Structure formats: structure tokens, C-alpha cells
């Protein structure tokens, strides 16, 4: 039996017995407040998260909303008045401003009024509230704060009295928004869809996973031949392990191709995370072809239940295990996994978005490690906002950032823009993990360059390529790749790699090439590729 004076937040009818299951607004707001406080506590602002949770759905206590939710579910209501507006989010924003004042509430109001629609432009928030205050609907007198003392912890918090750097303001705004949005969705799911709720979380911690990585790397070392390259890889690994307990901050790992950068950077990140009790590792990569390769390796080490792929070419339905498949689908919403492998686009679009679906995951980046692989591929036209964002996440949200590449770009000091007015100051301190005395570029110089500056025809280049049995030829354009491929003889296997191929075909072909190169019964393997193989695709050719 639903009482007329019950303030309903969510309800559904039990399929088995027809009984109405009610979540009161008080229950929902307290549940959201507890979760949002836990999320915001990761960057030292639990009282801010709690305030957001306690206020975000106060508008559901309006008569208009209570009539609406009952009518939508076919329930009787004694209130016969007609209400034109049953929206609710703006009410919490108005109460936040009244309760906490203009100076303190500016980092709460937008999050509350936007938690269903997406963040508004900061300059529009005042006008939105003004319009609502002038409307008749807000004058019902059916909303109030039962216990204003609940918010005293927030009002008295040192941070509420401090000033946020303007360039960091919008990142803090999004981070608080993320805490509220995810807490709201999760608490609703806990009541409305308990089966999905139970599938979330329960992943291993990074401390649980570290021994698996160490055992995997030890096995590789035990089976490796005593060569100069393998000794250098071991040296890089030991240096990463030795420096991993350093304080949180910005780090770079500059290791030439073949130096074991992928596993050594992961070892540094995991040991750094464990030493600082950090939550997860997020690896951002510019190309999906490298992501598939990296994610495959990580799943081999840690199991697919602990590694989340999140990019446009990954379909969770391809995961064979049903439990892992459903967990991965849910985790793409909020990145609640110990290890995430994603694209630069997915990462930075989320960091600068106003959408609820994009921002929801952001709070799970707090107190985590961000590994930017092939960092030289960051778009120069967006470098300034990217640097500002990374500084904000490091300074305010306890993130450590590791830049990995064979050739580090300039990210510190004065960075030149497209014109003198666009010049900006880069990251102040980036600590390189590999000391100069290692001289890795000299030690790993295994390529002999022969430069011929005379022009060559397609036929001449094809003839030159055909002189070798196992050879990779990299050209500038897809047209060049096609022309050369068509001119190669058919005496053996010839393949091409370019963005003309769909991602699945590209991934399949790269795997085929790796297999063929190990197959002694297949002496001729010639590949024509565009520049997509130049950044992180793990293929070794003699020529």
C-alpha cells in the first residue's frame, strides 16, 4: 500500500506478486550522498559530494513531481490540481544557492541542475535559476531543507573558502559532476535493477595483479637468450622497478623501439600505484591497432575480467564469457576496472565534455595513473588545453602521468604555439625514468640507413623490394601502397596494411604477418604498409 504522503523517488511493480516496491526520496538522496562522498573523497572533497547527493533530487518532493510519478505508473492521487512543470533538478540548485550563498555554491549549482541534461555553460546558470524563481511552480512552498546542519561540514570545509585557479575550475566542475552523475545512476540501478548492480565491481585490485605481472616478466626473462637487446630490456625493467615508489607527479619513459617499453612502463605504473594506494591504470593510445595489440597482451597476463577495452572498434559482445561480457558492458559507463585501455580521443573528449555519459567516468580517474603511450602523437593544435588538463588532474585529483615513447616531444618549458601570442608554459617538472648514461638510443641502434635522394618509379621500387624475401616497405600514401602491392610478384606471400582496411581486417592481417614471420616453411613474406606501422605495431622484419 502506497501512502499518499510518501515522497517517492523510484518505484516498480514486482513481477512475481504484483507488490509495488518504493524507494523514498530520502532513501535515494542518502544513498547518492554516501556514494558521491566516497567518490569525491578520492580527491579530498567528501563533504562536497555529500552536499550534491543530499540536494540533487529535492525537487522530487514537489507536489507536481509526486503527482507525475504516480500518474505515470497508473497510481491514484488525491491531488487534482494540474501542473504544467514536473521537472525537478533545478530545485536543488536553488536551495544550494540559498543555503550556501553565491560564493560557495557556484561549484554545486550547475552540477545539480544539470545531472540529467549535461552541464550548462557556467554563464547561463544564473539565468536558468532566475527563470525558475520567477515561475509560479516554485512558489508552492512544498520544498525545504529538513536539517540545514547536514551541510555545515561542507560550508566549514577549508576548500569551500579557497579559490580555484580559473584554468582548473572547469575540470573541478566536471569532476564533481561525475561524482554526482555516477552515484545517482548507481543508486537508482541498485534499487531498480539489482542484477546489473551485482555484476559491477568485484574486480581485483592492482596489488592483487602485480604478482601476475612480475611472474610473467620473470618467465620471459628466464626463457630469453643472453643477447645485448635482452640485457638492455632487463636494465630498463630494473630501472622502472627501482624508481616506481617516487612521489606522485609527471614522469617520462623514453625507450627506443625494441627496449621493452610496454611491459616496463606497466611494471612502473603498477608498482607506483601499489606504493601510493592508487585505484587503477588508464592507458591511452593514439591508434586502435596498437590498442588491440596492447589489450591482448594485458588480457593474457591479467585475464579479460581485469582489463577493459574502451574504443570505437571494440564490441563487448565479442567476449565469450557471459559474466565478463556483461561486466565489460557496464564498466564502459564508468571505468570501474583496475586496468583500462582506451584511445586519446575517448580520454580527452571525456575530460572536456559536458555530457553525462562522457563525464560519468571521470571521478574514477582520480587517484589513478594515466599512461599516455606514443605521446608524440598528441595533436599540437590542442596541446595547450591538454597540458592544462593534465596539470589539473595531477595537482587536484592525485593523478600520476607517465609519458611513454621512443622520442619525447617538448611538453615542458616554453612551448611555441601557432603564433607568438599562442606560446604557453608547459609542465614544470617531468622526471625522466631512464638516466642519460644508459644511452639507450646508441645501444639500440640496430638500423642501417641508406638514403637515396634520386627519384624512383613504382616499378623500380617494386623490383628493389622483390630482391628480399622477408621485407617491409613503408610508403606515404594509400595510393602508393596499392601501386607497389600490385607490382610485386606472386612468388610467396604479399600483403598490404593501410587505413583502407577495416579495423577487424587490419588486426587480422597484423596477426597473420606475425605468424608468417615465425613460419620457416614460408620463406617469402613481403608487406607494403603506410605509416600506420610506425607507432607501436609490434612487427620485426630483417629489411
Predicted feature descriptions by range:
Residues 280-291, 464-489, 494-496:
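Conserved strand-helix element at the start of the C-terminal RecA-like helicase core
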Residues 278-302, 311-314, 410, 478:
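Conserved Walker A/P-loop ATP-binding site and its immediately adjacent core
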